Amino acid sequence: MFKAFGIVNSSERNIHVEGLQDYRAIGAFSFLGRYRVIDFPISNMTNSGIEYIQVYVKNKPRSLVEHLGTGRHYNINSKSGNLQLLFSEHSGVNDIYNTDIDNYYSNLECIEAVHYPYVVIAPNYMIYTTDYSKLIDAHIESGADVTMLYHSVDNAKENYLNCHILNLNRQKGVLSIEHNHGNAKNRNIFMDTYVMSKELFISLIHKAKEISSLYTLADVINAGCRDGELDVRGVSHRGYFASITDFKSYHDANMDLINIKTAQTLFD
């Protein structure tokens, strides 16, 4: 039996792809003419042996629900696995309160009911391939509380401006998580991908709700890094990586992969 279940989270509040996101979730965007963006995180999970996956849907769910169906096209075994779509209860007061923590808290019973000891959390708006089974093994071997995946770039001044960055020490320990403000070109872009125990994940959800209704999972982990309460490690990703955070990044990612050599870094 595999050690972990998967969570595919919806896009953050500050991300908006003009002209497209008003009609469908980013995960439902067409990509390269034959995929949807959400195919990448789900395929990463199923190809890594993760068969129990929760997909969090924030808004405009119809096209996403139609595409995902029962998950059979991802080779999810319906007897041993499940592709579960979960919806959040939106705050009608202000969208600023509709955080990932709020989504998880609204569906806490579904998380608690899962019998796997570890969880892999990935976003629905980033394009990359990786083997999560190796990431989980590295996490367990390190003894860290949380493992975070990052990609080192040299163009952070102009790109990835809606992403987080990781500040690391020499041992790849995470010192802090910050927004990329475009003030340096070399940055470690956080890929919004976490590995941790289910028990710790649930405790972080409760802690974030106690601290602030505005807190995200990244916020509560960042607080733990700064206070020394959490041992958080970074793992570097190799290969193609794109973050779909606006129309330009969506267009550029599609254009990048026309080049066969670039495409090989994603699909090989």
Model-derived segments and spans:
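Short aromatic/hydrophobic "clamp" motif used to bind/position activated sugar donors
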Residues: 119
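Conserved core of the sugar-phosphate nucleotidyltransferase
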Residues: 128-203
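A conserved hydrophobic position in a structured secondary element of the catalytic/binding core
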Residues: 59, 196, 245
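N-terminal nucleotide-binding beta1-loop-alpha1 segment
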Residues: 1-32, 43, 48-50
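Active-site acidic Asp-centered loop
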Residues: 122-123
